[in-house]
Structure formats: C-alpha cells, structure tokens
Amino acid sequence: MVPVFAHLTCSSTSQVLQTLDTSQSNRLFSNCPQGAMTPGIPIFSPMMPYGTGLTPQPIQNTNSLSILEEQQRQQQQQQQQQQQQQQQQQQQAAVAAVQQSTSQQATQGPSGQTPQLFHSQTLTTAPLPGTTPLYPSPMTPMTPITPATPASESSGIVPQLQNIVSTVNLGCKLDLKTIALRARNAEYNPKRFAAVIMRIREPRTTALIFSSGKMVCTGAKSEEQSRLAARKYARVVQKLGFPAKFLDFKIQNMVGSCDVKFPIRLEGLVLTHQQFSSYEPELFPGLIYRMIKPRIVLLIFVSGKVVLTGAKVRAEIYEAFENIYPILKGFRKTT
Amino acid sequence: MASTSRLDALPRVTCPNHPDAILVEDYRAGDMICPECGLVVGDRVIDVGSEWRTFSNDKATKDPSRVGDSQNPLLSDGDLSTMIGKGTGAASFDEFGNSKYQNRRTMSSSDRAMMNAFKEITTMADRINLPRNIVDRTNNLFKQVYEQKSLKGRANDAIASACLYIACRQEGVPRTFKEICAVSRISKKEIGRCFKLILKALETSVDLITTGDFMSRFCSNLCLPKQVQMAATHIARKAVELDLVPGRSPISVAEAAIYMASQASAEKRTQKEIGDIAGVADVTIRQSYRLIYPRAPDLFPTDFKFDTPVDKLPQL
C-alpha cells in the first residue's frame, strides 16, 4: 500500500511550519462547510471529518510557540484519522469517481466544488482546481515534497513535560531572614544553603530565593505555570515589603518523558551510535544519548520509557523525540 | 650466542659477497657475521650489555653501575638529567652528622605529579595482581589525559583509578567498578564520573561488558570446579539470549548464574558468599535469580551432571 501522504517530520524547517501555519488556518475555516454542501460527489476527508464531533479548535495559548505545537499535534492527530479514513474509503474507491488534486490548498471559496483529497503536508504551489486529473486512482502516489524517510510516520506519541526550571530577577536585595520568618512555607538554613526555600501549592512548585534578589523556580509542568508561579513568589516577596520587580524571566531547563511502548535493545543502540551514546549498566541502567541537534540529553531505558532533558523550549523536546523515534524503532526487541 | 638479528633500515655494513644478506650480530664477541658465507663483516661492535652485574645482597652503597635506572622514555620527559650523589668521605658531613650538600630535590618538578600517579597505579595494580601490560596501558592513558589538561581539576588518584578501569576494559579483561574501588581510595561515583570524562577527552570508547568476562575470576575466587564455571557461563549466556533479565547489570546476571550452577552441583555456595566476592548485594542476586529460575531446565548445558536435580533447586 503506497502511503499517499508525504509526511512531515518535526525536523523540518521553520519555513515549512510557517507556510503550513498560514495555509492550515485558511483551511480550517474555509474547507469544511462548503465541501459538505456539494451533492452527489463523495467527499474525501477534509480537514475535519464529519461525524466525529470535532470542531476546529480555536487557538487558546498565549505563547506563540505553542501555537505551532498545537498545530503540529493537530496535524498528527488528523493524519491518524486520515489514515483510518483512507482505509475505509479505499474500499469504496471503485465506486467513487474522485477528483484528486495534488495539493489541497486553493482554499478559496470555489474550492468547495471540487472535493479535494486532504493532503496535510504538501507545499507545492497548488495547481488550479480545474486541472486535476480525471482518472486518478487512490493509489496514485503524491509527489512527496518533504523528503520522507521510508515508512516513517510521526510517532503519534507526544512527550509530556514533567518539570520546568526557570529563573527571574526580582531586582532588589532581599533580607532572607525576614522573608523566612514572616512568609509561610519558607525554610532557611544558612549553614546548609544560602537561600530561602519557599513552596506554594498551586501550581505546585518550589522556589529558591537568594539574597541578591535572584530566584529559581522549579517543579512546574508547563511554561505558563512556571511563569505564573514565579509571579506568585514575587508577589509574596512584594507583600513582605520589598520592592520586587519581575525582570528577565527565563526558562532554563525543561524535562519531558514518554513511552514508546516497546522494549528496546540498548546494546545494539550503543554499538551503532557510539559517538552519542553512553551505556554503562554498572553505573546507570539507562542509556544516555546526547543528541547534537537539538542539544538534548535523552535517557533511554529497556522498558521503552524515554526521558528528555536540557531543552530551553518545548519544540526542542518534540523535535528530539521525533528524531529518536525511528532510531528506537530500529532497535525494537523482537521477542 | 647469536642474538636476534637486526633489520638495518640503513645498512651501513653489508657483506661484500652477499649484499642482501641480513647480518647476524654476535654481541659476545662484538661481531657482525654474514650468515651466508660466515664472513665477519663488522667487528669491535660496542657491547650494549650492562657493565656490572649487581645482586641484591651485595653492599648496596657500592653500586658500580654508572648508567643508573632504565629510562622510561614514553612516560617521563626523558630522564637524562643527573644528580649529585650522597657524599661518601668524611668531608661531606658537617659537625652534626648531616650531609653538607643536600640538594636531591626538584629533579623533575613538571613530572612530579605524574610520577606520583604512576607509583599509585603500580600499587593499585599490584593489589589485584594485574599484569605489566595493563599497568603500561594505564600509564599511557594517564599520560595522555594529564597532557591534555582537560581533567586538570580532578584528583589525580581518581583519574588514575579510572585509567586503570579503562585499561582493564581495553585489554579484554574488565574489572568491575567495585573491584577498582576496593584498591583505591576514591568512591565509585567519582571513578564513574572520571571514566566518562576520560572517554570523552580521549575520544575513545570501550566495549560493553558481558557476563562471560567475569566468570573465570569469580568462580576461581569461590574455588568452584571447572564444570561449574562452564555451566555458569552457559547459563548466563543463555539467560541474556532469551532476554530473561532485561535491564539487569551483567554482573548481577553472572552472579545469579553462578549461584544456580553451584547449587546444582556438589559445591554449593550461598548467596552471601557470592555477593561478598563480587561486591553485589545478595538481594540483587535474589532478584536476578528469581528471573532466571523459571527457565532453569533450558539454561543448563546439556552435558551437565546434576548433583541436585533441576526441580530441587532452591526457590527464593
């Protein structure tokens, strides 16, 4: 079965992402309703398949980065739906006379007349809808635009963020003793460590507050939560009487984890990727893989669990996982 | 007695009749002889043997050798300096009996740390009876690391221990970290850290350890006969092939295999004994043993003589 879609791996360039971005947003709002109205011609799945109860999701996050991720993830979900749909529809293919276009954009109004095969990742300049071939079979391979490694689908697994470490400068010198005495949930042991350790319950985080006014906030599960928690700590310090500001908030480290759901042959992996891997069962049961691009350290375990750390932005974690997934699939344990 | 023939890169002397013949050196007589016709081509060749033979029970102060210790050219930076010896006559001592000229220090200040480390390496290797080739390899590794200066902040002993570990691995006879810990004052954690740093600094890598690397050493430390050792090797290898012990350290698997083999033979060993020898906790052996116990009949070699049959093996 020829995979009809050219699949986008997350290591594609940002340009690709941006063009996808714009085209996708167009499609979101133009393709769906009109395609449904055309009678008599069976419709290949547009962006939102009917009957699944899905509606185009409005973009919620304030972070511009996460918009990209959201869309990537949406694409991945849709691809899976696509493939399911495609399998169903190939059975009906003999009956259907389908007009197929090599790309699906031309997303302007009249596009609704020609139901277009949804192709999530082609970026060629769209031929005009009128020039679609008349007798395509569903098995006609699309011209892959992004070079796809054979049989590489995006894994469909999304690493979950487990910890975010961020720093912020409160901009004034602090008296740790008064903070420790007056604030709740604060501990200060100057002989052991020269900072106040403060905890808040929502979001569940811990902060180290130093006398220079700098603060480290750990334990949050998302960038927004980390920022919110840091602001809460700054407010606590402010309420204690210090002229606290919120300068240079920066996320220093992000940790994510996921499960590839199959056991992995670590010995094979260390043999082939010697310059990146370090596997010493005497020292640590997992393989430590230092990826160069993006610069992420992955801990890979025999059970199939993977921990990714060292990222400054969420996209690096996703990209690193998409890079490692085909490699791990190659070292799947067969028994 | 003819010594080994030297292959001259620039043949300065050749036999006039046989220019292609490789001359044989007879160092006792100081001759270079053509093997084809027996012509003595070069004579009065300087004897490079030692001038005197010294024995340990001779008066040690009267060592007539004028050349000193053998050089260590690969390691120290060429030891061609000389030292002023201790005085022998009465004039060299002042009124209190102290020698007047006391400068025997700072002979190689740049290499002092390195020589100290070599001494330490030799001591450590001696404790676990490592052969000279491993010690030489360790010295070489240490010299490379020391000259690179990328690990300059680390304790020299830690780097020396890690070099010893890497040398054992490279020679194909790995020692466990715990064994190196036992002869060194450095903690396992620090040795592990230095090990990873050295591999990165020298841009080398080492092979993965396998269960068979340790079998002969552990079994002979436990005084187990050869059949038990071979059986244990077979069990451990089969267990890894059948993937009964995913994610377990090869040491633990080897230990469990030794336990199973010894319990099935006449020479039984307890988990505690095996754990003491290998530096593995006996709960670890128990865990690995539980994983291989269900497939015990498949793991034994076919020609093994059971003293205790397979179904009577202890089940923990």
UniProtKB/Swiss-Prot annotation, chain B:
Keyword Transcription belongs to the record? yes
Phosphoserine: modified positions? S70, S76, S92
**UniProt-listed CDD domains:** CYCLIN_TFIIB_rpt1, CYCLIN_TFIIB_rpt2
- Protein residues bound to Zn(2+): C15, H18, C34, C37
Region (Necessary for TATA box-bound TBP complex formation): which ranges? 244-316
* Residue ranges covered by zinc fingers (TFIIB-type): 11-42
Superkingdom to which the source organism belongs: Eukaryota
Q: Core promoter DNA-binding: where is this region?
A: 189-193, 249-252, 283-286
Q: Show the PROSITE patterns listed in the entry.
A: TFIIB (PS00782), ZF_TFIIB (PS51134)
A cellular component term from Gene Ontology for this protein is: nucleus
Q: Which UniProt keywords apply?
A: Acetylation, Acyltransferase, Chromosome, DNA-binding, Metal-binding, Nucleus, Phosphoprotein, Repeat, Transcription, Transcription regulation, Transferase, Zinc, Zinc-finger
Q: Which compartments is it annotated to reside in?
A: Nucleus; Chromosome
Q: How is it modified after translation?
A: Acetylated. Autoacetylated; autoacetylation at Lys-238 stimulates transcription activation.
Q: Modified residue N6-acetyllysine is at which positions?
A: K238
GO molecular-function annotation terms? acetyltransferase activity; histone acetyltransferase activity; promoter-specific chromatin binding; RNA polymerase II complex binding; RNA polymerase II core promoter sequence-specific DNA binding; RNA polymerase II general transcription initiation factor activity; TBP-class protein binding; zinc ion binding
Where are the sequence-type repeats located? 124-200, 218-294
InterPro entries recorded: Cyclin-like_dom, Cyclin-like_sf, TFIIB, TFIIB_CS, TFIIB_cyclin, Znf_TFIIB
Q: Which residues are noted in the entry as DNA-binding?
A: K152, R154, K189, K196, R248, K272, A281, T284, R286, R290
Main location per the UniProt record: nucleus
Reactions the enzyme catalyzes: L-lysyl-[protein] + acetyl-CoA = N(6)-acetyl-L-lysyl-[protein] + CoA + H(+)
State whether it acts alone or in a complex, and with which partners, per the record.
Found in a ternary complex with TATA box-bound TBP. Part of a TFIID-containing RNA polymerase II pre-initiation complex (PIC) that is composed of TBP and at least GTF2A1, GTF2A2, GTF2E1, GTF2E2, GTF2F1, GTF2H2, GTF2H3, GTF2H4, GTF2H5, GTF2B, TCEA1, ERCC2, ERCC3, TAF1, TAF2, TAF3, TAF4, TAF5, TAF6, TAF7, TAF8, TAF9, TAF10, TAF11, TAF12 and TAF13. Associates with TFIID-TFIIA (DA complex) to form TFIID-TFIIA-TFIIB (DAB complex), which is then recognized by RNA polymerase II (Pol II). Found in a RNA polymerase II initiation complex.
**Family classification:** Belongs to the TFIIB family.
The protein's job, in short, is: General transcription factor that plays a role in transcription initiation by RNA polymerase II (Pol II). Involved in the pre-initiation complex (PIC) formation and Pol II recruitment at promoter DNA. Together with the TATA box-bound TBP forms the core initiation complex and provides a bridge between TBP and the Pol II-TFIIF complex. Released from the PIC early following the onset of transcription during the initiation and elongation transition and reassociates with TBP during the next transcription cycle. Associates with chromatin to core promoter-specific regions.
Q: What is known of its domains?
A: The TFIIB-type zinc-binding domain is necessary for the interaction and recruitment of RNA polymerase II to the core promoter, the formation of a fully competent pre-initiation complex (PIC) assembly and basal transcription initiation. The C-terminus is necessary and sufficient for interaction with the TATA box-bound TBP complex and for the formation of PIC.
PANTHER family cross-referenced by the UniProt entry: TRANSCRIPTION INITIATION FACTOR IIB, TRANSCRIPTION INITIATION FACTOR IIB-RELATED
Q: What is this protein called?
A: Transcription initiation factor IIB
Source lineage: Eukaryota, Metazoa, Chordata, Craniata, Vertebrata
Please state the gene responsible for encoding this protein. Answer: GTF2B
